[in-house]
Amino acid sequence: MDEAAEPQWLDAEEQWNWFQFAYALVRVPAALEAQAQRDAGIGHFEYLVLSALSMAPEHTLRMSDLAEFTASALSRLSNAVSRLEKRDWVHREPDPADGRYTLATLTEDGLAKVEISAPGHVAEVRRIVFDPLTKAQQRQLGVIAQRMLRAIEPDHTSVEERARRAFGVNG
């Protein structure tokens, strides 16, 4: 932006909508964190890692793909996976197809933890995200999220395609 140019300030309605959205961006993860701690004894990020692995083919993902899915730096993910390894829920090993990569695999105990934890997580997601919205609003939420993701990352479509391949999902 040109330093002499005046910023395009938000009007009153935009300010109000931004405030509501920004507050939701803080409160939704906090509510999911509280639920995961209360019901499963783990953090929401750890649950997200376990859940992602549970959906992956053979319950295994490259750490780099898992980092992308969780929108996390590899260092944060590595610390979380170390905690999960100590509980025998995940194990890591070099990727036999390409030793430059590390694979994270969900163990049987890890899968059992996901199966025990998932109902509470889904109930909380439903309570705070889906139940307050009509079906039309839910669809619109998905469209809005996609547009925002593309504004953040213009080639989001290719990121989405890589995630679908990693998880064995057809789009």
Where are these regions (language model features)?
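C-terminal regulatory/oligomerization modules of transcriptional regulators
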Residues: 1-12, 135-171
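Active-site phosphate/pyrophosphate-handling residues
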Residues: 16, 48, 139
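Short, hydrophobic-biased segments on the C-terminal half of alpha helices
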Residues: 63, 81-82
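Alpha-helical hairpin
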Residues: 10-13, 42, 61, 106, ...
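N-terminal helix-turn-helix DNA-binding core of bacterial DNA-binding proteins
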Residues: 30-73, 160
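N-terminal leader segment of winged-helix/HTH proteins
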Residues: 1-42, 89, 169-171
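Charged, amphipathic alpha-helical coiled-coil/dimerization segments
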Residues: 3-6, 82-140, 146
